[in-house]
Amino acid sequence: MALVIGLTGGIASGKTTVANLFKQQFKIDIVDADIVAREVVEPGTPGLNAIIQHFGQDITHDDNTLDRAKLREKIFSNPEEKAWLNALLHPIIREKMIEDLQQVTSDYALLVVPLLVENNLDSLCDRVLVVDVEPETQISRTVKRDNVSEEQAHAILASQASRQQRLDIADDVVKNNPNDPDLLLQITDLHEKYLAMCKKNLRK
């Protein structure tokens, strides 16, 4: 399997921007945990079938797709239901991510996982790349992008791993504050580093 670089960062840190630069500039294959999480609950999948069996058919729309708003309501204030859902989906998502990583054809792969730290998924990665920004930058970007209040943005931030927790597991860091060095320059340096590691078959 290709060298796997786990890409993570807090909300509004710029993970998607960084991943897209790797893909567009250097043709690096990407496995995105958010996309995988949607795929494993598409109509007809064992994941969605189990959710329907547990919560009832009205957890889906008329076209048999998952009604995410309803599911959020069911688990929002019910820790037991949330735990049940996580116990169902986390192993399926993990298995699908491994499958997708095995299909990679580029020299190395980016595994984009917003909650890499929280869900202990760094075990799937050879290296961890953290997109790091100041909390104030995250707050202002979240308010602007997601049309939420500052209070809501702070609450989202508080629910995620701390900046320090992410940096503690980082092998590499991309700085993405407004005054930091050019993003593409940082990514080009990392790309060259990862290619050199692939050639030497180094994992750490």
Curated annotation (Swiss-Prot):
It is an enzyme of class 2 (transferase). Its main location: cytoplasm. It is found in: Cytoplasm. ATP binds at A12, S13, G14, K15, T16, T17. Keywords: ATP-binding, Coenzyme A biosynthesis, Cytoplasm, Kinase, Nucleotide-binding, Transferase. It catalyses: 3'-dephospho-CoA + ATP = ADP + CoA + H(+). One of its GO terms (molecular function) is dephospho-CoA kinase activity. Belongs to the CoaE family. This is Dephospho-CoA kinase. It comes from Vibrio parahaemolyticus serotype O3:K6 (strain RIMD 2210633).
